[in-house]
Amino acid sequence: MRQPFSYRPQFQLGLLMGDPFALSTISLGIIGWIIALGGSIGASDQFKNFGWWGLAFEFFVILCVFLVVATDSVEPYRQMLLAFLALATMYVTNSTNNVVYNGTSASSASGAGHILLSIINFLWMIYFGTTHEAGIHAWVDSFAADKGHSYNNDQFAMRRSNPFSLHDQQRQSLGVPGRPVSAYSAGMGGVANYNGLQLGGFENSSNAEPHQASPAFSQQQQQQTATPQQATDSLFVATEYPYRARAVYAYQANPEDANEISFDKGEILDVSDISGRWWQARRDNGEIGICPSNYVELLA
């Protein structure tokens, strides 16, 4: 049995702005709804009374899709959205049949709006009805900017670009409030700043105490390669992993993104953060990185 957990989604408009598919379909849905409403008002004498309920329900569905995308809550509400979309599609297609053959300009406008709404509903059913395993779903997601990056929240953006950065509360518990923590890792020979900079492959270093590298030391490190023993003595702040998850599907990390990790189907991962689309996880071999949340399930 999966252990229930509570997660209060946060509204992030950047999630919508960074997703071209969601932004374009929601925008077209609103435009289609306005056209359908205006045409239906103009052809009210020929418009069936039940059609008004269909328009109201379609507006509710568009609002639901907007909120689900903006709060990054697609997975828990996927089945609900599919049920709503099936009903809304039945309503708008039925209204299309009632107005498209009347011949007046208002009826034609209403029919065009309902046809556009039907197309948008079909696209949403295809997207929300499939998972990342489906090629078309993965292709659509590939256009999303920075894997859930929020453009209007700097703190959220820092978290997404570097899930290993320390929060202020963690820094205070270490006695270094507000101070950036730096470290260098095995075989890399450089200095990685864990305060919001891109990881660049430094995520799999060993555990040690935090320390702030001096400029002279940093310059020296750029001129020589760190040995495994040096990496063992390097300074790094460990992250807690209170959750455990099982891989539902196998995942191959993107070679262009050093932050991702690969894992096999059925593998057990330790997870530190379950918010957002990408979770920080640790494998049994100690490898640390981010994994897509829809590829794993939380364990009791």
UniProtKB/Swiss-Prot annotation:
Presence of the UniProt keyword Mitochondrion in the record: no
Superkingdom of source: Eukaryota
Residues in compartment: Cytoplasmic: 1-20, 71-79, 130-300
Location(s), subcellular: Cell membrane
PANTHER family noted in UniProt: FCH AND DOUBLE SH3 DOMAINS PROTEIN, HIGH OSMOLARITY SIGNALING PROTEIN SHO1
Residues of this chain annotated as glycosylated in UniProt: N102
Gene Ontology biological process terms from the UniProt entry: regulation of actin filament polymerization
Protein name in UniProt: High osmolarity signaling protein SHO1
Residues spanning the membrane: 21-41, 50-70, 80-100, 109-129
Gene Ontology MF term list: actin filament binding
Family of this protein: Belongs to the SHO1 family.
Keyword line: Cell membrane, Glycoprotein, Membrane, SH3 domain, Stress response, Transmembrane, Transmembrane helix
Location of region: Disordered: 202-231
SMART domains in alphabetical order: SH3
Biased composition (Low complexity): 212-231
Primary location group: membrane
Membrane association type: Multi-pass membrane protein
Lineage: Eukaryota, Fungi, Dikarya, Ascomycota, Saccharomycotina
SUPFAM superfamilies reported for this sequence: SH3-domain
Quaternary context: Forms homooligomers.
InterPro entries recorded: SH3-like_dom_sf (IPR036028), SH3_domain (IPR001452), Sho1_SH3 (IPR035522)
GO cellular component: cortical actin cytoskeleton; plasma membrane; site of polarized growth
Function: Plasma membrane osmosensor that activates the high osmolarity glycerol (HOG) MAPK signaling pathway in response to high osmolarity.
